[in-house]
């Protein structure tokens, strides 16, 4: 039988599941919508949706040809989930008034971190912080349900300021014993427990692998891991992500480390772009690319003539055609529009030691096709 990994990505409104082989064949894919996206216990739906997806997978018959060698989990963040499943989603408001409760040093750390302000808000607003022993990020909660192993996925060591250190947790009066230890992307977190295996209808002792935050999984799944590559991650919101060997700084740009040690990711975000008119959306896309191109030129970094589109809007070929014309960029799409799943596959096969590292896995697994020949 051919080797494959079961890729799971937790979104805000749905769970996406794909079965992908080591050479990038997307054997099976499905989406399971959540019943109540606004519930504070939405995380309890994740395993149910995964069970339903696995049932569809078995019903499809592909498992007679492809063996599942691992499960990989990625998901939205910075979502927080208590041990009993109480969920504080990434898009819920932070109570910034709590900053005044801390010393100046702690306030500075809160401003740097994506997670600390949310943990502090969670602690202040919800009794579940005190009642439960562990506080997880989103995908790590599902990993815990599958393995009973508590971890926090750190995409790369330079992300530490966006997460936390024990010193920063102490400064912000957060009990570090509630926060699971870090693990890298593409590592085996644990094995599927007998009860989880029975629930899902999968073999017990199946490795469960860290896929990481969804935006990082998407960058891996579009192979935006080389200097001078560009990805348009477009859904309800939109982000243009440029991989650079130079740290690019601008008031309109958010720069974070790449999952690859010698690169940075510079991004321009368009919040709620799906709510804009098509004309507004395209003009904002052009503006974002112009910002990144200008910044790259100022720093003598080569800027590409093409970009890879992923996400919901990437399934709209008519929109992509217009975007290509307006932005002057050639556009490529991957064999799976939901590149997070491809990124999960890269993490999974790296953990299984089929590839030396994530970058090598992406080179083999990610396939791209230009839309321009067909549409322009």
Regions found by a protein language model. Name each.
Residues 73-78, 185-186, 234-236, 305-315:
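Glycine-rich beta-strand-to-loop/alpha-helix junction loops that act as flexible
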Residues 51-69, 125-129, 168-176, 200, ...:
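Phosphate/pyrophosphate-binding loops at sites that engage ATP/ADP/AMP, CoA/4′-phosphopantetheine
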Residues 10-12, 107-213, 277:
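Gly/Ser/Thr-rich active-site cleft segment
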Residues 64-119:
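Active-site phosphate-binding/coordination module
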Residues 217-221, 270-271, 321, 332-367:
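Glycine-rich phosphate-binding/hydrolytic loop that grips phosphoryl groups
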Residues 1-85, 131, 198, 206-210, ...:
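N-terminal glycine/serine-rich phosphate-binding loop of ATP-dependent small-molecule kinases
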Residues 80-100, 136-140, 145-167, 206-280:
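Glycine-rich phosphate-binding loop of actin/hexokinase-like ATP-binding domains
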Residues 277-335, 340:
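Activation-segment/catalytic-loop signature of the eukaryotic protein kinase fold
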